[in-house]
Amino acid sequence: MPKNKGKGGKNRRRGKNENESEKRELVFKEDGQEYAQVIKMLGNGRLEAMCFDGVKRLCHIRGKLRKKVWINTSDIILVGLRDYQDNKADVILKYNADEARSLKAYGELPEHAKINETDTFGPGDDDEIQFDDIGDDDEDIDDI
């Protein structure tokens, strides 16, 4: 058999779709849409979300978002309400932490909404790491 001398298959040539770096325009809700927070991931492209109008709904992740946008619990999402089923909705968009904070600042989200803070560092976080000194004696490593 010939030796593998390539750098990978056809997926390498296609490359990754890196669209996280560009900032997108903030999308507000329209009529027939509602903001919601994910309570539980159910699998099979479905999730349980608490809409900010006070109704708990079973949401279906649409095909455009299904494998490209990963949705976790406590994420803020925009859902499209169904006219014929009040307890079901379709996920239209997932907001990242910065967009959710700006929605809260605009007054679109209620004050009690908890935004997941794991995506970005807050203003108080530093890049420095504080180490506790184990020994108080001033021994140099070269002297040992």
UniProtKB/Swiss-Prot annotation:
GO cellular component, one term: cytoplasm
Residue ranges of domain S1-like in the record: 22-96
A Pfam family reported for this protein in Swiss-Prot or TrEMBL: eIF-1a
Region of interest (Disordered), ranges: 1-26, 114-144
GO biological process: ribosome assembly; translational initiation
Chief location of this protein within or outside the cell: cytoplasm
Residue ranges with Basic residues bias: 1-15
Domain of life (superkingdom): Eukaryota
Oligomer and partners: Component of the 43S pre-initiation complex (43S PIC), which is composed of the 40S ribosomal subunit, EIF1, eIF1A (EIF1AX), eIF3 complex, EIF5 and eIF2-GTP-initiator tRNA complex (eIF2 ternary complex). Interacts with EIF5; this interaction contributes to the maintenance of EIF1 within the open 43S PIC. Interacts through its C-terminal domain (CTD) with the CTD of EIF5B; from the location of the start codon by the 43S complex until the formation of the 80S complex. (Microbial infection) Interacts with human respiratory syncytial virus (HRSV) nucleoprotein; this interaction recruits EIF1AX to the viral replication complex to facilitate viral genomic RNA synthesis and virus production.
Function: Component of the 43S pre-initiation complex (43S PIC), which binds to the mRNA cap-proximal region, scans mRNA 5'-untranslated region, and locates the initiation codon. This protein enhances formation of the cap-proximal complex. Together with EIF1, facilitates scanning, start codon recognition, promotion of the assembly of 48S complex at the initiation codon (43S PIC becomes 48S PIC after the start codon is reached), and dissociation of aberrant complexes.
Family membership noted in the UniProt record: Belongs to the eIF-1A family.
Name this polypeptide is given: Eukaryotic translation initiation factor 1A, X-chromosomal
Species name: Homo sapiens (Human)
Lineage, highest ranks first: Eukaryota, Metazoa, Chordata, Craniata, Vertebrata
